[in-house]
Curated annotation (Swiss-Prot):
Residues 334-461 are annotated as: Cytidylyltransferase. Pathway: Nucleotide-sugar biosynthesis; ADP-L-glycero-beta-D-manno-heptose biosynthesis; ADP-L-glycero-beta-D-manno-heptose from D-glycero-beta-D-manno-heptose 7-phosphate: step 1/4; Nucleotide-sugar biosynthesis; ADP-L-glycero-beta-D-manno-heptose biosynthesis; ADP-L-glycero-beta-D-manno-heptose from D-glycero-beta-D-manno-heptose 7-phosphate: step 3/4. The keyword Kinase applies. This is Bifunctional protein HldE. The gene is hldE.
Length: 461
């Protein structure tokens, strides 16, 4: 999918609150003699695209042909945006273009100074007319709302109505507790806090998540309903609730993660990618961005690199695994098998298994175990080779080799939450079923098996 997307260049229009993010890097190594405050010595300044402009930067970095429409003031920040973005900006005299100055010391943000005018723009009709003139050439529209006055109810409703009439998807990063102005959009991407405010729910735990995300879809006539859940991933409601689990990376700065998410979703929808796959990719993009400092864009090359982990490190002993699992409160999914010659059926089976929890552990029969179960001619591939093949898949989190004929001892030791087996176990005893909270049976892809592959090879000789 990444190779396909890397070759696309969809035309995407973005409207919203374009801002300037300024970073003042300082040395704060002493206390002022005048008051108990830090003395900040300025080392350098770094001016970046912020708000809707950061969504623009992300889309451009991904390879999209992006066009910006907005309203800025007749000031330095407005001029900076016009010089650095391809698009058209209406100038409202006397209006302050949003400018956020972050004071940074030792890679930590210690203070933020904002200059902005959050009153509703005076050029609504002109902006709508400009949009009507441009829209027909684009594959998707992004509304990036930071509540700075550009995306008024009138502007939002006009944009969504026009785009919908042309069958062009509209993706909205919303702000505030009233989402009614976004009614009819293709999707919204509120975070957990924003969704709670709009729904007036106390929490989104358990059944409340599905109830809430479905309510957003129905109340605001959305094609898809999405809630970003930070470290828990992205929740999607289409015909039913699905969770795209987050990708774990060290978090340095969450600034701009939401911008990267909506940029990837817009790029994917404009390129014809299925919505759940788009959510999975958006998670990977967010994981890359939060590992950086400040508002930063993401590219497909970075996402590819993110997925190229040292897969041998995913092969663990059961003792190592138990230590790692104790450190995280995650839903553990376990499955097992010989996986002698990995084929398409295995891939789809493991991919489905991963979606049922946060961490997927594959218990792998050792060479000695396979030989006892399958005969002297097996395995075809060694346990290390088989473990590396499984660990190379992004949806497999850990591989653990066991020497027994069944995984009972391993399951008893690790105590996973969910045990996965093939649908052929429907009327059979599942080893370890009494230890776990839940057993899930997954259908195999028809026509694929290691034995059939071996027979086919023998027949050709």
């Amino acid at each position: 999918m990444l190779e396909f997307l890397s070759q696309q260049k969809p035309k995407i229009l973005i409207i919203g609150d374009f801002m300037v993010d300024n970073y003042t890097w300082c040395d704060c190594s002493r206390i002022s003699p005048e008051a108990p405050v830090l003395v900040a010595k300025t080392l350098k300044e770094d001016k970046r695209l912020g708000g809707a402009a950061n969504v623009y930067a992300n889309l451009k970095s991904l390879g999209a042909d992006v066009f910006a429409l907005g309203v800025v003031g007749d000031d330095k920040s407005g001029k900076f945006l016009q010089e650095n973005l391809k698009g058209e900006f209406l100038i409202q005299k006397g209006r302050k273009t949003p400018f956020k100055n972050r004071i940074m010391a030792h890679n930590q943000q210690v203070l933020r100074l904002d200059e902005e005018d959050i009153s509703a723009i005076l050029l609504e009709n002109e902006l709508i007319a400009l949009f009507d003139e441009k829209i027909k050439d684009f594959k998707a529209v992004v509304l990036s709302d930071y509540a700075k006055g550009v995306l008024t109810p009138k502007v939002c409703k006009a944009v969504i109505k026009k785009a919908k009439a042309l069958n062009i998807p509209v993706l909205v990063d919303p702000k505030g507790s009233d989402f009614s102005k976004y009614s009819g959009a293709t999707l919204l991407t509120p975070n957990k806090k924003e969704a709670l405010e709009a729904l007036k729910f106390e929490n989104l735990e358990g059944e409340n998540l599905e109830k809430g995300i479905k309510k957003l879809k129905e109340d605001f006539a959305l094609r898809y309903s999405i809630i970003t859940l930070s470290e828990a991933g992205i929740a999607l409601f289409d015909e039913g609730l699905k969770i795209a689990p987050a990708k774990a990376l060290e978090v340095y700065d969450v600034t701009g993660a939401g911008d990267s998410v909506i940029a990837v979703l817009a790029f994917c929808l404009a390129s014809g990618i299925e919505i759940f796959k788009a959510c999975e990719l958006a998670n990977e993009a967010a994981a890359v961005v939060v590992s950086k400092i400040g508002s930063m864009s993401v590219s497909f090359d970075e996402i590819k690199s993110f997925n190229r982990v040292d897969f041998e490190k995913k092969i663990k002993s059961k003792e190592e695994l138990l230590t790692l699992l104790k450190q995280n409160d995650k839903k553990i999914v376990f499955t097992n098998g010989c996986f002698d010659i990995v084929h398409f059926g295995h891939i789809k089976y493991l991919e489905k298994a991963k979606r049922l929890g946060d961490v997927l552990i594959v218990g792998l029969n050792s060479d000695a175990s396979v030989k006892r179960l399958k005969g002297e001619s097996r395995p075809v591939n060694s346990e290390f080779q088989r473990a590396c093949m499984l660990a190379a898949f992004y949806f497999v989190d850990f591989v653990v080799i066991f020497d027994e004929d069944t995984p009972l001892e391993l399951i008893s030791f690790l105590k996973p939450d969910i045990l996965i087996k093939g649908a052929d176990y429907k009327d059979k005893l599942v080893v370890g079923a009494d230890i776990v909270s839940k057993v899930e049976l997954i259908d195999f892809e028809e026509g694929f098996s290691t034995s059939k592959i071996i027979e086919k090879i023998k027949d050709k000789k």
